[in-house]
Amino acid sequence: MSSKDFFACGHSGHWARGCPRGGAGGRRGGGHGRGSQCGSTTLSYTCYCCGESGRNAKNCVLLGNICYNCGRSGHIAKDCKDPKRERRQHCYTCGRLGHLARDCDRQKEQKCYSCGKLGHIQKDCAQVKCYRCGEIGHVAINCSKARPGQLLPLRQIPTSSQGMSQ
C-alpha cells in the first residue's frame, strides 16, 4: 500500500479528511494518508498475519494474540502453557553469547561502526571504506580523489577496473 492510499477504509479517490466511511474526520495529526489524494481504484489487501485476503494486518483478528513462545494464536507468551522456549542470548555490544547488551561488562568500551570491533571508533578504523572512491583506509571527508568541498555522486565512482575520469 502506498502513502497515497487511505488506511482507514482501503478505498481510493478521496481525501482522508473527506472519507465517506468516517475515519480521519477532521482530526489533526497522526492520520495515515491525511492530505493525500488517492487514485481511482479499490485496493485489494492480503493480511500478513493470517494470510486472508480482503483485510489488512491492522484489522486482523490474530493481531496481538500470537504467542512468541509457541507461535500459536489465542494467547500471548506470558500465558503460554508450553515450556518456555530456550533462546540464545546474544550481546550486541561484544558479540558474545550468553548475555544481553544491558548486562555486558564491556559496555564502556568504544565500538567501531565499520568493522564492529571494540577498542576504536570508525574515524580511527583501518578497515573503513570511502564512499567517494571506494578505497579502504579512509572516509569520504578525507578522500584525496575529489577537490575539497566537492562530493562525487555515486554514479561517478569508478569500479575497480576503471580509472578516475574527470
Curated annotation (Swiss-Prot):
InterPro entries: Znf_CCHC, Znf_CCHC_sf. SMART domains: ZnF_C2HC (SM00343). Disulfide bonds: none annotated. Keywords: Metal-binding, Repeat, Zinc, Zinc-finger. The keyword Metal-binding applies. One of its GO terms (cellular component) is cytoplasm. A zinc finger (CCHC-type) spans 4-21, 45-62, 65-82, 89-106, 110-127, 128-145. Pfam families: zf-CCHC. This is Zinc finger CCHC domain-containing protein 13. GO terms for molecular function: mRNA binding; single-stranded RNA binding; translation regulator activity; zinc ion binding. GO terms for biological process: positive regulation of cytoplasmic translation. It comes from the Eukaryota.
